[in-house]
């Protein structure tokens, strides 16, 4: 089964996840099915009811992604009508064959509203998922995955699955093909996410979502207390190592789990880290006291490049504001004097019109108001500007009010690959270099080198002084 998060295809399919976008900030996730086993009763099959109308799933299946779906007329009262429990004798005789599920009734379009059918992405899933715990939003996990060097083929350890937001984002980052039972033609490392959750109910819900979204084999959810049992897959003592390249700890006390993330565990068990590459780690902590204890433990365990980052993402809306009396009733403009000169000119034009009106009222033989002069028309009329419309006005910026992230501190660190003298010797034999000179004999100290250089200078001075004495004797 292919996941709609990774390979959605061009059309929606049955038994797959789809996102129903009602507004910009309102999206409903649903599994497309013709029949709803839990909430039956609709003649049209499974129906999703929204404030913009009812949408039978028969109208959502096999539709191109991004389509606009019109609401349908659904008999909502049919769900409350109970079927007759007693049947006549002739009905009992005729019911010898097994009853199949009735085919959904063809819906009729309504004028209540519409929605857009979208395929799921980690960004849309984060905005629409059911919140069970604190959610890692897009501004946070995008930066975290960048700093963790998550790429196709990597293995990520996630401690604290929660609502599954980071799980879906990380599996997309490391995806490098679906696992299969066939023997691969070439050696290729498939990406994988190993998620650990302490709460049993949350772990089960994440496991169900992973199954529904077609991520089996790419995400492995484990119910475990990582503080005590570590990060091995299967049995905590004799389990298999995930050989992780990146680690994300969303825990209340991440420093308690760092003792299991070492190259050589003291208990003699296998390390969960990849021995052939450096390992990147990130911890998600809301308090500075947690950050201090985490950094102290990281330094004791040999982690390098430790840094702390706080992500403050804010969306900025940029637009042009046009102000002036000559714009008329154009949408998005402010009909107000843009300067003092324009206000004075407008006042003078109104005074001239008032004087002209009073002058015509005093004339006894005047039947109608005369037409304004050409000068007044030029002043009072609108003048077309030579500046294009998209360049008119001032550039205005407004920041987003509601920030979809959390005030938390991200701690990053790197654990280098373990390197021994045997590894150094093997690499020098495999890739020799003429510039590297092997030291011969025992190394000399600085004092010994200074003494030898002083003796060498004294010897040179003696050799220079001998020819001078011989010439004087002659």
Curated annotation (Swiss-Prot):
<dbReference type="GO" id="GO:0031515">
    <property type="term" value="C:tRNA (m1A) methyltransferase complex"/>
</dbReference>
<feature type="binding site">
    <location>
        <position position="202"/>
    </location>
    <ligand>
        <name>S-adenosyl-L-methionine</name>
    </ligand>
</feature>
<feature type="region of interest" description="Disordered">
    <location>
        <begin position="423"/>
        <end position="474"/>
    </location>
</feature>
<comment type="subunit">
    <text>Heterotetramer; composed of two copies of TRM6 and two copies of TRM61.</text>
</comment>
<keyword id="KW-0808">Transferase</keyword>
<feature type="compositionally biased region" description="Basic and acidic residues">
    <location>
        <begin position="423"/>
        <end position="432"/>
    </location>
</feature>
<keyword id="KW-0489">Methyltransferase</keyword>
<dbReference type="Pfam" id="PF08704">
    <property type="entry name" value="GCD14"/>
</dbReference>
<comment type="function">
    <text>Catalytic subunit of tRNA (adenine-N(1)-)-methyltransferase, which catalyzes the formation of N(1)-methyladenine at position 58 (m1A58) in initiator methionyl-tRNA.</text>
</comment>
<dbReference type="InterPro" id="IPR049470">
    <property type="entry name" value="TRM61_C"/>
</dbReference>
<feature type="region of interest" description="Disordered">
    <location>
        <begin position="356"/>
        <end position="390"/>
    </location>
</feature>
<feature type="compositionally biased region" description="Polar residues">
    <location>
        <begin position="358"/>
        <end position="367"/>
    </location>
</feature>
<feature type="region of interest" description="Disordered">
    <location>
        <begin position="75"/>
        <end position="109"/>
    </location>
</feature>
<protein>
    <recommendedName>
        <fullName>tRNA (adenine(58)-N(1))-methyltransferase catalytic subunit trm61</fullName>
        <ecNumber>2.1.1.220</ecNumber>
    </recommendedName>
</protein>
<dbReference type="GO" id="GO:0160107">
    <property type="term" value="F:tRNA (adenine(58)-N1)-methyltransferase activity"/>
</dbReference>
<feature type="compositionally biased region" description="Polar residues">
    <location>
        <begin position="434"/>
        <end position="443"/>
    </location>
</feature>
<dbReference type="GO" id="GO:0030488">
    <property type="term" value="P:tRNA methylation"/>
</dbReference>
<comment type="similarity">
    <text>Belongs to the class I-like SAM-binding methyltransferase superfamily. TRM61 family.</text>
</comment>
<keyword id="KW-0819">tRNA processing</keyword>
<dbReference type="InterPro" id="IPR014816">
    <property type="entry name" value="tRNA_MeTrfase_Gcd14"/>
</dbReference>
<keyword id="KW-0949">S-adenosyl-L-methionine</keyword>
<keyword id="KW-0539">Nucleus</keyword>
<feature type="binding site">
    <location>
        <position position="250"/>
    </location>
    <ligand>
        <name>S-adenosyl-L-methionine</name>
    </ligand>
</feature>
<feature type="binding site">
    <location>
        <begin position="163"/>
        <end position="165"/>
    </location>
    <ligand>
        <name>S-adenosyl-L-methionine</name>
    </ligand>
</feature>
<feature type="binding site">
    <location>
        <position position="197"/>
    </location>
    <ligand>
        <name>S-adenosyl-L-methionine</name>
    </ligand>
</feature>
<dbReference type="InterPro" id="IPR029063">
    <property type="entry name" value="SAM-dependent_MTases_sf"/>
</dbReference>
<dbReference type="GO" id="GO:0005634">
    <property type="term" value="C:nucleus"/>
</dbReference>
<feature type="binding site">
    <location>
        <begin position="225"/>
        <end position="226"/>
    </location>
    <ligand>
        <name>S-adenosyl-L-methionine</name>
    </ligand>
</feature>
<feature type="compositionally biased region" description="Basic and acidic residues">
    <location>
        <begin position="450"/>
        <end position="474"/>
    </location>
</feature>
